Every structure is written in structure tokens, then in C-alpha cells.
């Protein structure tokens, strides 16, 4: 019986070489070699792994196992373990490793034994929690089903949507726990609580006048519907908007809760939470993106030879996995085809395509400029004429005037991406790059549209004439301007949700019915619509940016966004399965996931700008809100610091001073440059090692060719066989 396995027959040249002493064998004097050298040999590990089928191997190698076991179990002077060779790296069976572990425990001290036991218990508990959380993951089965039917690119969109649902839910928990709940409890005197309201000092009386247009007396039903859509009327005086939180402090028995400070710190908290979570997920996806893009040939090998999960026992799961691998291979082949096409372009073709791209980008800039100007004019018209419509009590006209900015923004968000999607077909990019470029262009449309809207509002809120000097803002048009901004964000969020539902019900499903039951050539040429990943991603990134900006002005906006995205998931899933078709050009999920998060991070960074301006520069409303006694919302921070002890005040002011900030910035830059240089050095070392591996593999192939030629020419293969056997069994530590 051979040590290569039961019933395995060795080739004749190996048997002949063994009889002549030209072949390395475990039963020879080499067994006395050091254990470390023998354990590096792949033949040694293979033989031990198969010792259950080859009983004579255990006897031949028993002395070597004894040496290794003795070295492993040898007690140390401090009573600890011998940590030179980790137990899991030894080529022993589970029973032998367990015996070795028990021997280590026998010689270990009580402290080491407790530390080992607690560490194992903690790791096991973490593993169980991780497995349980994976089974309890939201929409786990639905997303796996989508991945199998439509590929990993579309699956990445639904995973991204799930992430936003969880993020908004955590934002809602923060705002509700630290802002809404204390305000409601103190206003209603629950749990022996009370609230304190201090009238603003050194403020003109007319600046403190705020009479919300709440519904009083008998009103028509459509009035409630209008208020529900616009955030005015009965909604304006609820916990949904900034104006409700007109509290300076909440008292719970003898404990004072500083609501203005909590309001500001919670705003910073949800922004920091979003930033850290997005960065964490971006790093994970970027690492996977680098691995997938490192070597396409290696990716093919991994998918073909190691892509299948042999733990799958369900037939449906097997079909989904099969389709997922098929889409991934199609994506790789499509990328290789495009790379080959780009490499074969002539100079004339390159000049043509570059000229066409420049012309298309000029058209894109013109479309963007038209969108921005339309939004600015619509916002100014809406703010100037909404009060006129209210006085005339014309319900439809008032609703249209108030929703005019939202209608124009949504129209621009719908028309501009359609133009960009049509133009990008002529630019001849890859499927993945088409999505990225379309996303970037649509980001400028959607997010810049929100910026133009806010700029239009602030240009009217913060005016420079004599009317605004007394209060710092236009108190006649905006007595509580924070609630007005919150209402605009609320209308954008609601209107965007209504458009998504309307497009699914009145465009996607009728198109599906026409294509299915109408045999006209024009209808069949029109066909089913593909699931546009870039458009759908921009929809939710646009809504999330609105939520980040509007949460400061409407603390419960994350709850609305959570419900909105939860419903959108099922709407998009039903639309995808019943009315859409898979993309004709598959895309890679790893690059999509990373780029989606990168665009979302851009939206978050852009949200910092209007929030920073509102908190630090624009005067806070004197008639409503927790900051009515301060010039700006940020003024609560230095006011709170003045209540600290003198030593702590000096320390905080020292940290905020330029004397500390400049050296800290320089040191941070030095550390950043150091880690960048270190990463570059590691990358160069990895490239050198990869080149070395490729060179060694070529050398070995060259040697094999030479040995084959020597065998054919000499007719005496014994010497070649000797060289071959010694080369095959040399240590692989160089590789």
C-alpha cells in the first residue's frame, strides 16, 4: 500500500527511482531530519492527511509525530504553552490536537487556564451571535432570490436600500430618544416633569410673534389632505417640525435636561453615525473591489473551480447560485471584450470618440444650467405668491404654488437622467463606467437642485435691507424660518415618494401589459424596460440627502424616510420581477457597492454645507425653537462651556485655539503621509513577490520542457527522473 493513498499505484519510473535510491522516501534516513524542515514539505502533509487509508504510514512517521508532539507539549518555565508552532498548523488529526491541547492545559497555571477558557467562550458567543444575526438579517431571502434571477449588480441596489433603511431607523431612534421624547414628556408633565420657557432678551417684540396656521373650527376634508401633503396647518404645530420644540430646559424631578444642547449634539451625532458607518462599509467594499479587479484570470479560476458552495442542498438555492455564477462570468467576459475593443482602436477612431465625448459634455453642462435656473425661478415665484393664494383660499392653486419647487425639481430629476442615459450610449464606455459616469452627472442634477432650492430660500430669509436688521432675518415672511425649511424638505420627500409609486403603477405595469398582449411591431420593438441601476440608486441617494438636511428642521423626518424606503423595497421588487428585464450588459457587484457608497458619501458631505450655514451663520428664529434666546444655533456651545469650571474652560478653549489646531493638523498630515508611503511600499513589495512567483513558474515550465527534450534525445530517462523527483519535492517556502 502506498503512502499516497490506498490502492494508489505509483508510476514505473518512480518505483525504479526508489529502488535505486534516487527518490526521497519517508522510510529512509531523511526521517531523522528536523521536524520543521519536514513539515514544510507538501508530500509530508499529504501523506499524514491520508494516513487513515494507508495504515503503514502511521508506523513509519510515528517517531516524527512523537518528536513534534513532545516539542509541542513541553512545559515552559512560566507554566505557559510553547507558542512556536500553533496547534492548528500541525498535521495531526482532531483527536491528537485535542490531546495536545489537554496537555498544554495540564501544565498551564490557573490564570492561563481561565484566560483560555474565557477567550474560547467569548469567541464562541460572538460566532453564535454573528450566525444568528445573519439569519435575522432584513430581507435576506428576498435579496438572495434577486441575486440569482437578475445578477449581483441589481442585488447590490437592494442591499444598498436595506442599508439605508437601517441607517434611517437608527437616526430616528437618536432624534426621538434625545429630542422628541423629552420635549413631549415635559410638555405634558409626565413622570413629574416640567418645561422652562424663557422669553428672549434684547429682542424686538414683533420678532417673537409666531401664529402657526393651524386649522381651527370646522374645516373641509381636503384641507387636512392639503396639510398632510404640504406640512402646514395641523402638522405645523406637531412634533414633526422645529417650531414645536420651543423649550429652554426640561425638568425631571430635580434633574435639568438642556434641550437646546441635546438638539444640537444629537444633530452632530446622527451626522457622525452616518459618516462613520458609510466609511466603514466603503472600506470593506473597496477591499473587495481591489480583490476582484486584481487579476481577472484568477477570478475566472476562482469562480470555475471554487465558486460553488457544496453545502447547498436545496434545489432552488442551487439554481440561484448557478445563475449568480453565470452572471459573474458574463460580466468578466463583457469587460474583457470591451478592453480588447479599446486596445484595437486606431488613432482616427480615438479622435472621433474623444471629440464626440467633448461635444456631449457641453450638452450636459447646458442641461444642468437650464435645470438650475428653472429651480431658482420656481422657488422665488412660490415663496412670493404662496401667501397670496392662502388669502384667496383657493385650495388647488395654493397646493400647486407651494409644490411648484418640488414639481420643477422632480421634473428636472426625471428628464435630465433620461437625456444623460441616451447620450452616454454614444460615448462607448464599459457598463460599469457608464453607471459611474451617469451617477456623477445625475448627482450634480439632483443634489445641486436641492442646493439651488436652499440657496433660493436663504436669499429670501437672510436679506440685507432694513426690514431684516432688527431680527436678523425676514420675520414677516418667515417668523419661524426653520419650520419653513423643514416643510420644503418634507414636501420634497413626500413628492419623490409619490412619483416613484406613480411611475410604477402608471408606466411600468401598462408597458408590461402592452408588450405582453399587443403584437404590434412598434410595441414589441419598444419592449420591456431594463432595470436602470443608476437611476434607481440616484432616487434613494437624493432622498437620503434630503433626509440628512431636513432632520435638523424636522426631527422625525428619518421615521418618514424609513417607512418610505421600506415600502420602496417591495415596490421595486415587484416591478423588477413582473415588469422589468435583466440588464443586457451585466455589471460587477463589488464595483457597484463601492461606488454607490462613494456617491452616498458625496451626498452626506454636501449635506454638511447647508447644515453648517444654518447652524453657524444664519440667525436663529426668535419666535420658535430651542435656540430663540441665542443669535445662532451654535451659540449654545460657548454658552454651555461658560458653566464649566475655569480649568476645563481653559483646556477646551486651548484645544479650539489656533496654537493647538495648526500643530495638530501638521502632525495629522505627517501621519497620513507616513501611512500612504507605507501602503505604497507594501504594494510594491506585493508586486515584486507576484512577479517573482510568475518568474519561478516560468522557470519550472522551462525546466520541464528541457527535461522532456532530454528524455526524448538521450533515451535514458533515469537521470532526468532523478532530477525531476528532487525538484518536485523541494521545499516551497520560496513561493
UniProtKB/Swiss-Prot annotation:
Residues 1-164, 255-258, 377-403, 458-488, 570-594, 656-658 are extracellular. It is a multi-pass membrane protein. Keywords: Glycoprotein, Membrane, Transmembrane, Transmembrane helix. The chain crosses the membrane at residues 165-185, 234-254, 259-279, 356-376, 404-424, 437-457, 489-509, 549-569, 595-615, 635-655, 659-679. It comes from Gallus gallus. Probable component of an ion channel. GO terms for cellular component: plasma membrane. This is Transmembrane channel-like protein 7. The lineage of its organism: Eukaryota, Metazoa, Chordata, Craniata, Vertebrata. Glycans are attached at residue 385. Disulfide bonds: none annotated. It comes from the Eukaryota. Pfam families: TMC. The keyword Kinase does not apply. Its main location: membrane. Belongs to the TMC family. GO terms for biological process: sensory perception of mechanical stimulus.
Amino acid at each position: 500500500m502506498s503512502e499516497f493513498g490506498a490502492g494508489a499505484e505509483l508510476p514505473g519510473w518512480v518505483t525504479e527511482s526508489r529502488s535505486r535510491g534516487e527518490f526521497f522516501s519517508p522510510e529512509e534516513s531523511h526521517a531523522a531530519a528536523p521536524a520543521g524542515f519536514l513539515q514544510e514539505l507538501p508530500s509530508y502533509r499529504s501523506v499524514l492527511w491520508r494516513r487513515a487509508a494507508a495504515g503503514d504510514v502511521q508506523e513509519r512517521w510515528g517517531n516524527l509525530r512523537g518528536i513534534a508532539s513532545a516539542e509541542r507539549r513541553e512545559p515552559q518555565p512560566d507554566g505557559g504553552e510553547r507558542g512556536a508552532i500553533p496547534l492548528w498548523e500541525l498535521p495531526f488529526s482532531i483527536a491528537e490536537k485535542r490531546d495536545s491541547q489537554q496537555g498544554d492545559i495540564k501544565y498551564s497555571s490557573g490564570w492561563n487556564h481561565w484566560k483560555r477558557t474565557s477567550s474560547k467562550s467569548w469567541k464562541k458567543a460572538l460566532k453564535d451571535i454573528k450566525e444568528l444575526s445573519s439569519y435575522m438579517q432584513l430581507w435576506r431571502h428576498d435579496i438572495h432570490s434577486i441575486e440569482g434571477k437578475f445578477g449581483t449588480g441589481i442585488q447590490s441596489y437592494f442591499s444598498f436600500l436595506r442599508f439605508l433603511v437601517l441607517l434611517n431607523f437608527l437616526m430616528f431612534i437618536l432624534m426621538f430618544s434625545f429630542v422628541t421624547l423629552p420635549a413631549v414628556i415635559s410638555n405634558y408633565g409626565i413622570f413629574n416633569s416640567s418645561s422652562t420657557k424663557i422669553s428672549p432678551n434684547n429682542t424686538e417684540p414683533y420678532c417673537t410673534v409666531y401664529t402657526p396656521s393651524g386649522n381651527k373650527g370646522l374645516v373641509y376634508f381636503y384641507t387636512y389632505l392639503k396639510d398632510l401633503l404640504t406640512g402646514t396647518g395641523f402638522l405645523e404645530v406637531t412634533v414633526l417640525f422645529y417650531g414645536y420644540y420651543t423649550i429652554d430646559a426640561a425638568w425631571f424631578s430635580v434633574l435639568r435636561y438642556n434641550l437646546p444642547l441635546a438638539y444640537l449634539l444629537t444633530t452632530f451625532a446622527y451626522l457622525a453615525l452616518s459618516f462613520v458607518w458609510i466609511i466603514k462599509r466603503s472600506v470593506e467594499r473597496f477591499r473587495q473591489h481591489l480583490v476582484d479587479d486584481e487579476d481577472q484570470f484568477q477570478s475566472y479560476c476562482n469562480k470555475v473551480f471554487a465558486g460553488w458552495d457544496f453545502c447547498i442542498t436545496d434545489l432552488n438555492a442551487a439554481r440561484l447560485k448557478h445563475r449568480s455564477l453565470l452572471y459573474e462570468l458574463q460580466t468578466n467576459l463583457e469587460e474583457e471584450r470591451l478592453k480588447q475593443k479599446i486596445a484595437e482602436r486606431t488613432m482616427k477612431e480615438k479622435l472621433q470618440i474623444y471629440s464626440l465625448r467633448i461635444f456631449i459634455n457641453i450638452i450636459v453642462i447646458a442641461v444642468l444650467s437650464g435645470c438650475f435656473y428653472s429651480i431658482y425661478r420656481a422657488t422665488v415665484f412660490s415663496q412670493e405668491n404662496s401667501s397670496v393664494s392662502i388669502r384667496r383660499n383657493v385650495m388647488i392653486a395654493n397646493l400647486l404654488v407651494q409644490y411648484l419647487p418640488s414639481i420643477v425639481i422632480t421634473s428636472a430629476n426625471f428628464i435630465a437622467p433620461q437625456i444623460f442615459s441616451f447620450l452616454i450610449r454614444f460615448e462607448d464606455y464599459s457598463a460599469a463606467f457608464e453607471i459611474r459616469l451617469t451617477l456623477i452627472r445625475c448627482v450634480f442634477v439632483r443634489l445641486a437642485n436641492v442646493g439651488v432650492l436652499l440657496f433660493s430660500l436663504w436669499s429670501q430669509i437672510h436679506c440685507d435691507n432694513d426690514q431684516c436688521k432688527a431680527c436678523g432675518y425676514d420675520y414677516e415672511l418667515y417668523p419661524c424660518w426653520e419650520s419653513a425649511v423643514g416643510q420644503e424638505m418634507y414636501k420634497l420627500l413626500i413628492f419623490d415618494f409619490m412619483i416613484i409609486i406613480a411611475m410604477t403603477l402608471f408606466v411600468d405595469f401598462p408597458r408590461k401589459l402592452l408588450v405582453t398582449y399587443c403584437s404590434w411591431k412598434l410595441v414589441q420593438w419598444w419592449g420591456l424596460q431594463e432595470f436602470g441601476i443608476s437611476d434607481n440608486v440616484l432616487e434613494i441617494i437624493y432622498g437620503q440627502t434630503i433626509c440628512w438636511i431636513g432632520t435638523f428642521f424636522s426631527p422625525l423626518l428619518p421615521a418618514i424616510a424609513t417607512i418610505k424606503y421600506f415600502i420602496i423595497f417591495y415596490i421595486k421588487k415587484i416591478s423588477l420581477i413582473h415588469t422589468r428585464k435583466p440588464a443586457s450588459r451585466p455589471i460587477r457587484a463589488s464595483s457597484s457597492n463601492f461606488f454607490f457608497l462613494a456617491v452616498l458619501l458625496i451626498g452626506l458631505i454636501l449635506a454638511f454645507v447647508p447644515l453648517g450655514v444654518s447652524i453657524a451663520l444664519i440667525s436663529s428664529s426668535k419666535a420658535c425653537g430651542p435656540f430663540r434666546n441665542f443669535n445662532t444655533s451654535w451659540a449654545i456651545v460657548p454658552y454651555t462651556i461658560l458653566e464649566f469650571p475655569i480649568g476645563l474652560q481653559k483646556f477646551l478653549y486651548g484645544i479650539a485655539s489656533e496654537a493647538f489646531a495648526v500643530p495638530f493638523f501638521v502632525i495629522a498630515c505627517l501621519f497620513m503621509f507616513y501611512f500612504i508611503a507605507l501602503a505604497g511600499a507594501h504594494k510594491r513589495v506585493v508586486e515584486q513577490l507576484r512577479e517573482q512567483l510568475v518568474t519561478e513558474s516560468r522557470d519550472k515550465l522551462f525546466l520541464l520542457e528541457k527535461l522532456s527534450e532530454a528524455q526524448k534525445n538521450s533515451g535514458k530517462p533515469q537521470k532526468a527522473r532523478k532530477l525531476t523527483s528532487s525538484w518536485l519535492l523541494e521545499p516551497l517556502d520560496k513561493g
